Amino acid sequence: MAKNEKIRIRLKSYDHKLLDFSAGKIVETAKKAGSQVSGPVPLPTEKQVVTILRAVHKYKYSREQFEIRTHKRLIDIANPTPKTVDSLMRLDLPAGVDIEIKL
């Protein structure tokens, strides 16, 4: 690969433990392949709140709130080798983690 290339990996998940486990696995695999790794960098957590009425017809002031949090991490791999890319492609990560890769 070219000299000043880098791979940027963004991970998203609702479960922060699963996200940290996946990020650790990616960092460990990239370091074993001989690349420079920076991260995982925690990005701001998105919080989505939904408010609904508890009763169907009346009791407007009785409401219930639900929230869902999206946790994010960023990993940069500088000067990746072909061995690094191959080992990252073979990596088996758990379901529930969204992975976005930019070259």
UniProtKB/Swiss-Prot annotation:
Gene3D superfamilies: Ribosomal protein S10 domain. The keyword Ribosomal protein applies. Signal peptide: none annotated. The keyword Nucleus does not apply. Keywords: Ribonucleoprotein, Ribosomal protein. GO terms for biological process: translation. One of its GO terms (molecular function) is tRNA binding. One of its GO terms (cellular component) is ribonucleoprotein complex. HAMAP family: Ribosomal_uS10. NCBIfam families: PRK00596.1, rpsJ_bact. PANTHER family: 30S RIBOSOMAL PROTEIN S10 FAMILY MEMBER (PTHR11700). Belongs to the universal ribosomal protein uS10 family. Involved in the binding of tRNA to the ribosomes. Part of the 30S ribosomal subunit. This is Small ribosomal subunit protein uS10. It comes from Clostridioides difficile (strain 630) (Peptoclostridium difficile). The lineage of its organism: Bacteria, Bacillati, Bacillota, Clostridia, Peptostreptococcales.
